[in-house]
Amino acid sequence: MFAFYFLTACISLKGVFGVSPSYNGLGLTPQMGWDNWNTFACDVSEQLLLDTADRISDLGLKDMGYKYIILDDCWSSGRDSDGFLVADEQKFPNGMGHVADHLHNNSFLFGMYSSAGEYTCAGYPGSLGREEEDAQFFANNRVDYLKYDNCYNKGQFGTPEISYHRYKAMSDALNKTGRPIFYSLCNWGQDLTFYWGSGIANSWRMSGDVTAEFTRPDSRCPCDGDEYDCKYAGFHCSIMNILNKAAPMGQNAGVGGWNDLDNLEVGVGNLTDDEEKAHFSMWAMVKSPLIIGANVNNLKASSYSIYSQASVIAINQDSNGIPATRVWRYYVSDTDEYGQGEIQMWSGPLDNGDQVVALLNGGSVSRPMNTTLEEIFFDSNLGSKKLTSTWDIYDLWANRVDNSTASAILGRNKTATGILYNATEQSYKDGLSKNDTRLFGQKIGSLSPNAILNTTVPAHGIAFYRLRPSS
């Protein structure tokens, strides 16, 4: 039995034009980097951060855009007599300024963590009521990014206004320091953050914490479906759970302020290769931050080749900043072991007049899927040039780095990294304008008016395309 959903949304001006003034000039594209929490949790140290940064650089990932090295919870040992935070000397013997300087000297950016509560989620000192002292601590230690959590908030939530003012206090304090600091809210979407986040922050989490499961329900993540206004966000939320919650929120994100679907689980847990590809593709397409959650010293070749797929990253870093829209959604009868099964089609405009299209199979069997120009350009009027033109179809995964080459790179063969796109030398925007083939995938055909785009999509997998006006 099928159930059908078709999206007809009132799009904000931000969604139409892809323009949102960044409140602090940062976050013009979604942030990319690495965060320790998903793999290491509280097992953090100076050595972990610096070794990870060196490895990310050696793997060519820094020059693909993964430049933020984000230290999560558990770094503090308390406060000094003046009320300033103190780093744990056992974990960070040279202090946070040393970490920042090492990262900056190697062209990385340094991120740290606190919580808009009395304590952090792991029970360390929080920043509620201490915003100015703590913002100055971060600025003094040359921090470039703050992840700001939501634990132990003393009940200061329940309406958008209450949460807004609690998070605005740190926003104001960061700005007062005079240091540009990317401000990443982690309040789990509580109190409709997507409505007010862009006025005070550069990104905002929109759900409970992700887990390395594609569809598995979990009682600790009680809301599902399209419950974007979840009263108890929880954690251990599956990839499809978070994606469906994010579906209506794209109209409230754009340049300078992004919906954050949480860190990437590629290379974490036991996701299949098709699930990892779908996960990475959809996070890229909806313009979520691309934050590696894996241990980069222990990546398998297939996961590395996903993180380094320039044609997919280029979708995420597209300068117009418009998240893709879910155009349709069907439930299907071939459910998986958890009773989950659905298929979806997503579409979104790109800066150079191209269009990104995804056919997502959340069912348990491989299946034929299709779409048309009328669905792809669902907002266009009949007779629109988009509907009467022929479009070339590029498979965004067709030129993926093979496992042999990925293994060579992981084995520290620096020559092998020469095939990778280098966004430090040439931005994604410039590479697209110069038709760098690494950013387009492989042309597999064309789609003419009244024709149908047909493909076969594996279970828990994706077909991911860039459409370009036919040459």
From Swiss-Prot:
Cellular component GO terms, alphabetical: extracellular region
The enzyme's E.C. designation: 3.2.1.22
> What residues make up the catalytic site?
D149, D209
What's its top-level EC category? hydrolase
Q: Which GO terms describe its molecular function?
A: alpha-galactosidase activity
- Tell me which Gene Ontology terms the entry assigns under biological process: melibiose catabolic process
Q: Which cysteines are joined by disulfide bonds?
A: C42-C74, C121-C151, C221-C237, C223-C230
List keywords of the entry alphabetically.
Disulfide bond, Glycoprotein, Glycosidase, Hydrolase, Secreted, Signal
Q: Which residues are glycosylated?
A: N105, N175, N270, N370, N403, N413, N422, N435, N454
Enumerate the residues binding substrate: D72, D73, K147, R205, Q251
Task: Name the PROSITE patterns on file.
Answer: ALPHA_GALACTOSIDASE
Residues annotated as signal peptide:
1-18
Q: Which reaction does it catalyse?
A: Hydrolysis of terminal, non-reducing alpha-D-galactose residues in alpha-D-galactosides, including galactose oligosaccharides, galactomannans and galactolipids
Induction statement: Induced by galactose and melibiose and repressed by glucose.
Pfam families referenced in this protein's UniProt entry, alphabetically: Melibiase_2, Melibiase_C
Subcellular location per the Swiss-Prot or TrEMBL entry: Secreted
The UniProt subunit note reads as follows: Homotetramer.
Q: Which family does it belong to?
A: Belongs to the glycosyl hydrolase 27 family.
Descriptive protein name: Alpha-galactosidase 1
Gene that produces this protein: MEL1
